[in-house]
Amino acid sequence: MTDDAARFGDPRIPAETITSQSHLFHLSAVSPTLYDGGSLQQAHEDNFPILKGQEASIQLITLQPGGIREPHWHPSAWEINLVTSGVATWVLIDGNGNNESFEAHVEDVVFAPQGSFHYFENRGTEDLNVLIIQNTSAPEDKDNIGIGQSLSTIPPRVLSAVFGIPAETFASMKKINDAVVILRST
């Protein structure tokens, strides 16, 4: 049962998404989070209260041409991705070290297992839209470990040893404190 007082009085929930039906959410009414390279809209337990405790969330990612979904992994969630427009170029490395690269077209479904390292990008000339369903009720930034943030926490001397490049190269790299989520290739 939904607590209507909490649902309709919570300032974190945009009024445009609220309906008299507790099971209905207007994703199109959520202001997208904008990035250089695309945008993200999502429904999760913080803005769609019926999801609390259900271990479910949904995202709509739009990548502009040249946009990249930052290489990342989710420690506690798998995801199912449905391409609704455009072509996504995928790279996925699973927990067994299997590495796959492929293109996903409209109506193709891509599964990224929990803990797998993955990303997709838009190498095309039109926007790419991917609908993502995850088995977590948390917002994307609460169950997402991006490569930029991860590499920023490793000392330059260690990265130098791994890649065989002078430590100064890594010391001069921009430090990233949060997952970027979406970026643009240069």
Write out the residue ranges for each language-model feature:
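A short, N-terminal "cap"/entry segment at the start of jelly-roll beta-barrel domains
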Residues: 1-60, 64, 70, 160-186
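Beta-strand cores of secreted/periplasmic/IMS beta-sandwich domains, seen most often
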Residues: 60-62, 84, 120-121
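Intrinsically disordered, low-complexity regions enriched in proline, serine, glycine
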Residues: 71-73, 92-93, 100-101, 129, ...
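Short histidine-centered beta-strand/loop micro-motifs
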Residues: 50, 70-74, 101-102, 121-122
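Ligand-binding loop in jelly-roll beta-barrel domains
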Residues: 78, 89, 105-106, 114-140, ...
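Glycine- and acidic-residue-biased ligand/ion/polar-headgroup-sensing regions
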Residues: 65, 74-95
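Short acidic-glycine-tyrosine-enriched beta hairpin
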Residues: 63, 80, 94-115
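A contiguous, mid-protein "functional segment" used to position or interact
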Residues: 126-174
